[in-house]
Amino acid sequence: MQLVLAAKYIGAAIATIGLLGAGIGIAIVFAALINGTSRNPSLRNTLFPFAILGFALSEATGLFCLMISFLLLYGV
């Protein structure tokens, strides 16, 4: 029984590593937005929706990793 519990904890810890990638992805998206806006301020209204889309996709992958981690911990 202890081995199964330890495997659950290790699996959940490994699944949360994906949150690191989501955080880095969000930082890259907004760094590119700031860089693009500083180079050409008139494109701000064009670039912002693409940045929000990139943010949403990056955050979704992080939430999927978190969901898998919770399923490993509290699932059957």
UniProtKB/Swiss-Prot annotation:
Keywords: CF(0), Hydrogen ion transport, Ion transport, Lipid-binding, Membrane, Mitochondrion, Transmembrane, Transmembrane helix, Transport
Membrane topology: Multi-pass membrane protein
Biological source species: Wickerhamomyces canadensis
Residues at the site labelled Reversibly protonated during proton transport: E59
Pfam families: ATP-synt_C
GO molecular function: lipid binding; proton transmembrane transporter activity
Subunit structure: F-type ATPases have 2 components, CF(1) - the catalytic core - and CF(0) - the membrane proton channel. CF(1) has five subunits: alpha(3), beta(3), gamma(1), delta(1), epsilon(1). CF(0) has three main subunits: a, b and c.
Cellular localization per UniProt: Mitochondrion membrane
Name of protein: ATP synthase subunit 9, mitochondrial
Entries under InterPro entries matching the protein: ATP_synth_F0_csu, ATP_synth_F0_csu_DDCD_BS, ATP_synth_F0_csu_sf, ATPase_proteolipid_c-like_dom, F/V-ATP_Csub_sf
Ranges annotated as spanning the membrane: 14-34, 52-72
Gene Ontology biological-process entries: proton motive force-driven ATP synthesis
Gene Ontology CC terms: mitochondrial membrane; proton-transporting ATP synthase complex; proton-transporting two-sector ATPase complex, proton-transporting domain
UniProt family annotation: Belongs to the ATPase C chain family.
Main location: mitochondrion
